[in-house]
UniProtKB/Swiss-Prot annotation:
One of its GO terms (molecular function) is adenylate kinase activity. Residues 30-59 are annotated as: NMP. Its EC number is 2.7.4.3. InterPro entries: Adenyl_kin_sub (IPR006259), Adenylat/UMP-CMP_kin (IPR000850), Adenylat_kinase_CS (IPR033690), P-loop_NTPase (IPR027417). The gene is adk. Belongs to the adenylate kinase family. ATP binds at residues 10-15, 127, 178. This is Adenylate kinase. Pathway: Purine metabolism; AMP biosynthesis via salvage pathway; AMP from ADP: step 1/1.
Amino acid sequence: MRLIFLGPPGAGKGTQAKRLTDKYGIPQLSTGDMLRAAVSAGTEIGKRAKAVMDAGGLVSDDIVNQIVSERIEAPDCAKGFILDGYPRTVPQAKALADNMRKKNQVLDAVIELKVDEEALIRRIENRVAETIAAGGTVRSDDNPEAFRKRLTEYREKTAPLSAYYSEQGELVTLDGMADVDAVTEAIERVLEKASA
């Protein structure tokens, strides 16, 4: 099972990916984790990424695409994987399609979790209030203003992927505002249909 989750921050992609990882035994691959692993392993591409990051730059699509391409060949990805935070742009999506085609792999599903952004902001505000009331530390990215900025960035940079995957006939859109269990069940129905 090879799967991509799309949706804005706070839509529940991480929660759903964890559930699928636990159930199917396939890895959730995040761009950040893959970059850190490549740098830590000292691979050639990891060294290139480290040089860019050490200089304070953004790692290029070419480097990210190569790291993802190498990672999806790892033995733990033999049964599939869930991509989290990749692709972020249409050029990355096209590079992924090319890489997978060369490996005779296909995506089983691209699932977009649609959410109401104002409801998401209220959800974050409530989470912050609950964390403060419990005496906990608020995550820096849970600041409502920072969260709004992440939503704007998502709309501008990542949202065009929905149109791209829709044109490819690969996009399935689900209600990310539904109960967590209901979303999981809907995702599993999509995956059953894809593997039939």
